[in-house]
């Protein structure tokens, strides 16, 4: 399922020297969808946010990163908020985020630290978004304003109440 270089079916980059088979993302999503629901116990899981991403992509007809860029980040004037930042910025502009001694065995710079997000190609409902303090501040200001920023409504007040 992995390769040390990009070739053929290995197109999802997990770090500088690790590529994942492109079928892995869909296989994982299929397993999530088919997993039986158990009740009466709590266990932390990213699955809900991954399912939320799948729902958003289905409803919008767009990949999540594209939808968020068009509907939120670009209109909000966010120029440094993106998934897969190495597509847009030089590596020296991206702060290293973690040292992965377990799986990828490298310092992660421009790659999501969360393994489940990394193995979905770096774009996931649970992790993978990179930004800077100023732009995170603008997103939170929009939430504090009940979904509005600079005179434009992005989210309903009810959605903001649920988020916060």
Language model features with spans:
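Short, surface-exposed loop or secondary-structure junction motifs
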Residues: 1-164
